[in-house]
């Protein structure tokens, strides 16, 4: 947990002259770079306007909302705060439980993408459970399409657990309609499960329109168990993922938005976002 003093210090650290440098990919066709606000969830709760301003000052241009934000303020209030900071909000996360009730909120927020954050553990422990999730995703995908939005699901590592020679992820991709259901690939959790993000982009690029970018520390064994032992987060460029290949392929495959996310940080989150942004500029230059 970070104190208010740490938050302010981190914010000031983020507002360096280096942060005023133009985006390295401004002249490229690379997707806009944004932040998944779960990274700064405590700071958002304490000072939404200040946190959004700090994100914008670093150089990020978009944000993605996290699940519990829909329960804390109206869509109109949240949209105004984001717009006032000079940011856009093309995508938002909502929990599987209660997802049905969030479409109007998402529309009022102006989202292009409505994303289910995860398959609940209560059903994500069997192949039948993933089949049920796939059916639900198709239903939500159809509803999103009717409302002018695109549905997607976000992965962790547990989707890659094996059931009689197949995986939960395989079942989700096989049983969902590509016209209705997109996949928001979280590069970290793919790697944590022992898979390769680049290979996934090659195979499923036609179904990936948004990405989560987070890096993974060296030395940790892969795992498909979603728990504290599977959390080896670090800033983009400070870990083991091959970002040059991932980013180039994402651009080639037509990914539309990329969101930096770091579930936990060892320094103030704004400082971590600054480091990831600076490293991404070098990678994309």
Show which residues each predicted segment covers:
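Acidic/histidine-rich catalytic cores of soluble enzymes
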Residues: 146-240, 247
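Short, acidic/polar
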Residues: 43-54, 97-105, 194-200, 243
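C-terminal segment of N-terminal export signals and the immediately downstream linker at the start
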Residues: 22-46, 54
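Glycine-rich, proline-tolerant flexible connector loops at the mouths of alpha/beta enzymes
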Residues: 64-79
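N-terminal secretory signal peptides and thylakoid transit peptides that target proteins
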Residues: 1-15
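Conserved, mostly hydrophobic/aromatic
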Residues: 35, 55, 63, 82, ...
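Catalytic domains of carbohydrate-active enzymes, especially glycoside hydrolases
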Residues: 51-68
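Active-site acidic/histidine proton-transfer and metal-coordination neighborhood
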Residues: 19, 52, 88-182, 270
